[in-house]
From Swiss-Prot:
Species per Swiss-Prot/TrEMBL record: Arabidopsis thaliana (Mouse-ear cress)
Subunit structure: F-type ATPases have 2 components, CF(1) - the catalytic core - and CF(0) - the membrane proton channel. CF(1) has five subunits: alpha(3), beta(3), gamma(1), delta(1), epsilon(1). CF(0) has three main subunits: a, b and c.
GO cellular component, one term: plasma membrane
Keyword NAD appears in the UniProt entry: no
Keyword tags: ATP synthesis, ATP-binding, CF(1), Hydrogen ion transport, Ion transport, Membrane, Mitochondrion, Mitochondrion inner membrane, Nucleotide-binding, Phosphoprotein, Transit peptide, Translocase, Transport
Xref: Gene3D superfamilies: 2.40.10.170, ATP synthase, F1 beta subunit, Bovine Mitochondrial F1-atpase, Atp Synthase Beta Chain, Chain D, domain 3, P-loop containing nucleotide triphosphate hydrolases
Protein name per the record: ATP synthase subunit beta-2, mitochondrial
Locations listed in the record: Mitochondrion; Mitochondrion inner membrane
Positions annotated to bind ATP: G231, G232, A233, G234, V235, G236, K237, T238
Single Gene Ontology MF annotation: copper ion binding
Similarity remark: Belongs to the ATPase alpha/beta chains family.
């Protein structure tokens, strides 16, 4: 306040001197006054003096007030100058001019176009000066014209969260797109949030048991980790995703969120229908029993929507983690399309591209998303991210930047799928940072490495077998091949979500039982059992029972 008084006295004396000089130079001018036609220097000094003599603001303007983490979304922002007008439209980029600086929205604030046929939300990205902001449209700008009124909502894009979102499909703005009515909830969160503070993070490394044998044994998922899922069309990626959703819900009581980033509309619809058929999503009165929420930003939508839909899905998952203490599974398909959408937005905003045409902010854009996916003292978000590798070039900046964030990779192989072994996870190509004796313990680690060694030896012998046949192998090699083929088939497993297709009941295999079963295989305890008895079963007890059944049927 003292500095304000000093500034006021200095400005008064300065403005008085300036005005006196003007009067002396031109006797016809009247005495100085804050009239509209006063000299520019005198007028500006007068405005600054007026600011200096005014009382300091008691609180920040509503537009700059931080958005609350929770509370129903409203659009009743009534600050001075809250209405702007569209002054330029270039595709998905819209410039909006406001009357004065008081109504100027902060970066990341959402604006709504008024009197538009459909709801059109804009997100502030740049301040250009002259009270003009550059925004990214979250929907198509067809029919938008200059001069159209735009409302400053005073808050970032805010979406519904909580259990009411389970079994529902939302878009980037949190609007339901499944034609099943409004999402009724009292909980809303902004999509732009800071990553959890360092003091809130859980420091321990812990396995997230999935009940899937090949995953838990050879490439275990970290609780709160990030997993890259590599798989082409028709190798069982969708079924594996649905089984993970089902098993996490049963074993950990957690929920799942599926974020379709640049998703094909047909694939998104197919996934939704399959989830209904398999019981992951329930309709009608049983909707509250659903285990998954879906957030789609379809391939035909503008880049702004595709660049933000991943954040919308993550926000829904964060609520389950922070408010309900859940272990949440977050699926992002495809993380490359998230990067691609941000690249399109960056080009439209006029940024100079970086290597291979990607945005210069590639690492920070991806890091802002990935750093929010973590384990806290309240709960965890474990992310499974489908990754597209352009032209199979792993050195491309987009996948290379993504790999730096991953804790595990699950590779689905077409060769294994062609053998009829599902899940078609490649046990040699799939990796995990958790595969360490310090984290898993000696027993689990040694069993996993033993299984991989047998499978690798079998792979090395396949060329010899193809040329010379099994008879030319040594006795040790024959034993290796026999055990490897049994291990390969034992890695198959019937899924709960596939019961309606296969007729076989799904199996959830406990981690301890899983380790003991494969250790018994490596020790040769089950060398006398046929390969067929290891196919599509749960634990080793089922293998023994199936072998006895086969023996009885063959003897009959």
């Amino acid at each position: 306040m003292a500095s304000r008084r000093v500034l006021s006295s200095l400005l008064r004396s300065s403005s008085g001197r300036s005005a006196a000089k003007l009067v002396n130079r031109n006797p016809r001018l009247p005495s100085p006054s804050p009239a509209r036609h006063a000299a520019p220097c005198s007028y500006l000094l007068g405005r600054v003096a007026e600011y200096a003599t005014s009382s300091p603001a008691s609180s920040a303007a509503p537009s700059s007030a931080p958005a609350k983490d929770e509370g129903k979304k409203t659009y009743d922002y009534g600050g001075k100058g809250a209405i702007g007008r569209v002054c330029q439209v270039i595709g998905a980029i819209v410039d909006v001019r406001f009357e004065d600086q008081e109504g100027l929205p902060p970066i990341m604030t959402s604006l709504e176009v008024q009197d538009h046929p459909t709801r059109l939300v804009l997100e502030v990205s740049h301040h250009l000066g002259q009270n003009v902001v550059r925004t990214i449209a979250m929907d198509g700008t067809e029919g938008l014209v200059r001069g159209r009124k735009v409302l400053n909502t005073g808050a970032p894009i805010t979406v519904p969260v909580g259990r009411a979102t389970l079994g529902r499909i939302m878009n980037v703005l949190g609007e339901p797109i499944d034609e099943r009515g409004e999402i009724k909830t009292e909980h809303y969160l902004p999509i732009h949030r800071d990553a959890p503070a360092l003091v809130d993070l859980a420091t321990g490394q812990e396995i997230l048991a999935t009940g899937i044998k090949v995953v838990d044994l050879l490439a275990p998922y970290q609780r709160g980790g990030k997993i890259g899922l590599f798989g082409g069309a028709g190798v069982g990626k969708t079924v594996l995703i649905m089984e993970l959703i089902n098993n996490v819900a049963k074993a950990h009581g957690g929920f799942s969120v599926f974020a379709g980033v640049g998703e094909r509309t047909r694939e998104g619809n197919d996934l939704y229908r399959e989830m209904i058929e398999s019981g992951v999503i329930k309709l009608g009165e049983k909707q509250s029993e659903s285990k998954c929420a879906l957030v789609y930003g379809q391939m035909n939508e503008p880049p702004g929507a595709r660049a933000r839909v991943g954040l919308t899905g993550l926000t829904v998952a964060e609520y389950f983690r922070d408010a309900e203490g859940q272990d949440v599974l977050l699926f992002i398909d495809n993380i490359f399309r998230f990067t691609q959408a941000n690249s399109e937005v960056s080009a439209l905003l006029g940024r100079i591209p970086s290597a291979v045409g990607y945005q210069p902010t590639l690492a920070s854009d991806l890091g802002a998303l990935q750093e929010r996916i973590t384990t806290t003292k309240k709960g965890s978000i474990t992310s499974v991210q489908a990754i597209y590798v352009p032209a199979d070039d792993l050195t491309d900046p987009a996948p290379a930047t993504t790999f730096a964030h991953l804790d595990a990779t699950t590779v689905l192989s077409r060769q294994i799928s062609e053998l009829g072994i599902y899940p078609a996870v490649d046990p040699l190509d799939s990796t995990s940072r958790m595969l360490s004796p310090h984290i898993l313990g000696e027993e689990h680690y040694n069993t996993a490495r033993g299984v991989q060694k047998v499978l690798q030896n079998y792979k090395n012998l396949q060329d010899i077998i193809a040329i010379l046949g099994m008879d030319e192998l040594s006795e040790d090699d024959k034993l290796t091949v026999a055990r490897a083929r049994k291990i390969q088939r034992f890695l198959s497993q019937p899924f709960h979500v596939a019961e309606i297709f296969t007729g076989a009941p799904g199996k959830y295999v406990d981690l301890k039982e899983n380790i003991n079963s494969f250790q018994g295989l490596l020790d040769g305890k089950y060398d006398d059992l046929s390969e067929q008895s290891f196919y599509m079963v749960g634990g080793i007890d089922e293998v023994v029972a199936k072998a006895e059944k086969i023996a009885k049927e063959s003897a009959a």
